[in-house]
């Protein structure tokens, strides 16, 4: 299935000059969403994954159906102040400032094999932060799966030491 035909492109959103790739049009088509989920499930099975991790919010909508299909758990990565129990945190730089992501301190057990999922790889900052959190808890990142990779932003450079799969790639 050619998933690219299900991606909507929104010009000048969220700001002028940006051509936003919207995956909600994959999700609102049961066949396309199921296909994308199944592809990531197969990728995860080959890596003997114990748990799925996904950053908010779209990492949830990619990772949760994969975890459910595999009969394994899902651990969320969230912005600071959004998780109710004790957390670990990772602060990283943005173009104009910083951001903080957190995970529950008991979300990952040492040695667990982790697949990180998200909708889109752009600059790689969010996924790099998720990797740092997983590894701080002793998890082993055995794969990272995206629906879309924006190759022209070179986000792969931040995660080049990991096994990465993307279902759709945009060169420009």
Swiss-Prot record:
tRNA-binding recorded as keyword: no
Keyword Zinc-finger set for record: no
Any Gene Ontology CC annotation: cytoplasm
Gene Ontology molecular functions: adenine binding; adenine phosphoribosyltransferase activity; AMP binding
Record's function text: Catalyzes a salvage reaction resulting in the formation of AMP, that is energically less costly than de novo synthesis.
NCBIfam families assigned: apt (TIGR01090), PRK02304.1-2 (NF002633), PRK02304.1-3 (NF002634), PRK02304.1-5 (NF002636)
Assembly, per entry: Homodimer.
Protein name stated in the entry: Adenine phosphoribosyltransferase
Species assigned in the record: Staphylococcus saprophyticus subsp. saprophyticus (strain ATCC 15305 / DSM 20229 / NCIMB 8711 / NCTC 7292 / S-41)
